[in-house]
UniProtKB/Swiss-Prot annotation:
Source organism (scientific name): Gluconobacter oxydans (strain 621H)
Any matching Pfam family: RecA_C
Stored NCBIfam families: tigrfam_recA
Protein name: Protein RecA
Function of the protein: Can catalyze the hydrolysis of ATP in the presence of single-stranded DNA, the ATP-dependent uptake of single-stranded DNA by duplex DNA, and the ATP-dependent hybridization of homologous single-stranded DNAs. It interacts with LexA causing its activation and leading to its autocatalytic cleavage.
Acidic residues bias: start-end ranges: 335-345
């Protein structure tokens, strides 16, 4: 039998059974430009290589406690709302601070919030929201707090080996197809644990088994690397984000920015740092200059000057975005072990 006829027969049979478009040649597939949502950080948008977080994909953000995971996720929600999107937050940790979210630019009145009792309930709500196709961004905070119902109903000393990992694996198998079809960005926040008895390599691992590592298109490792002080008072954290996995662009880029208390990611700080990296802003000693005009002695003074002169800040931002290709190469780092002690694939 002729192979071409056999193939056409098989294709038409598949289309009759599963609907038009269920199978097609790659060349026939409509080319869709990656639709992204900004992270709220110019540097991280550049480091991701596509200008933000991709819709229709699963993203994992992990790191130690108080490293900025929820802050980064809330910035993404705020950016999606600015574009007129619908956003949801599944607060499994029951720890969302509405006042802080509002300060970061999130419209609390339109935010869909769920505080589920058990892991199964949280993931069922997530699946229903994604299937609706009406939600643009969904954040689950956090994987570690998705406690299986059997564990909640059992006694304190009971052993529940592998229940959490099985729950995550099952949920992600269901979610991954609907996430792609509905074009929803799903962000899982995750915590770090230490593996016992690791002599060599990185003892850190993330909770919830291995499924999320495989299903995530992007994995971000976020760490607090220092404190920002105003005289003796701590007013913020210096934060480093490393792209440990990226299916959309080259991984292993990292970016540093300031997270200021009550303000979130410091845009002015990023403009200075990226401006210096891209030779857009000149730094001579402690002085910062732009187009031969001095803008401040010391980083905090220069940041304040840019806040007071938004037209200059927007011009620096425009030039930084124009130099995104050059800057993304400057953000490249060597592959390092991720939270499992192995380089990401």
């Amino acid at each position: 039998m002729d192979k071409t006829k056999a193939l056409e027969g098989a294709l038409s049979q598949i289309e009759r059974a599963f609907g038009k478009g269920s199978i097609m040649r790659m060349g026939q597939r409509p080319k869709v430009e990656t639709n992204v949502i900004s992270t709220g950080s110019i540097g991280l948008d550049i480091a991701l290589g596509i200008g933000g977080m991709p819709r229709g994909r699963i993203v994992e953000i992990y790191g130690p406690e108080s490293s900025g995971k929820t802050t980064l996720a809330l910035h993404v929600l705020a950016e999606a709302q600015k574009k007129g999107g619908t956003v949801a937050f599944i607060d499994a940790e029951h720890a969302l601070d509405p006042g802080y979210a509002r300060k970061l630019g999130v419209n609390i009145d339109d935010l869909l919030l769920s505080q589920p009792d058990a892991g199964e309930q949280a993931l069922e709500i997530a699946d229903t929201l994604v299937r609706s196709g009406a939600v643009d961004v969904l954040v689950v905070d956090s994987v570690a707090a998705l406690v299986p119902r059997a564990e909640l109903e059992g006694d304190m000393g009971d052993s529940h080996v592998g229940l959490h990992a099985r729950l995550m694996s099952q949920a992600l198998r269901k979610l991954t197809g609907t996430v792609s079809r509905s074009n929803t960005l799903v962000i899982f926040l995750n915590q770090i644990r230490m593996k016992i008895g690791v002599m060599f390599g990185n003892p850190e691992t993330t909770t919830g088994g291995n499924a999320l590592k495989f299903y995530s298109s992007i994995r971000l490792d976020i760490r607090r690397i220092g404190s920002i002080k105003d005289k003796d008072e701590v007013v913020g954290n210096q934060t480093r984000v490393k792209v440990v996995k990226n299916k959309m662009a080259p991984p292993f880029r990292q970016v540093e920015f300031d997270i200021m208390y009550g303000e979130g990611i410091s845009k002015m700080g990023e403009l200075l740092d990226l401006g210096v990296k891209g030779n857009i802003v000149e730094k001579s000693g402690a002085w910062f200059s732009f187009d031969s005009q001095r803008i401040g002695q010391g980083r905090e003074n220069a940041k304040q000057f840019l806040r007071e002169h938004p037209e200059m800040a927007s011009e620096i931002e425009r030039r930084i975005r124009a130099e995104a290709g050059v800057l993304s190469d400057a953000l490249m780092t060597d592959p390092e072990p991720d939270a499992d002690g192995t380089p990401e694939d």
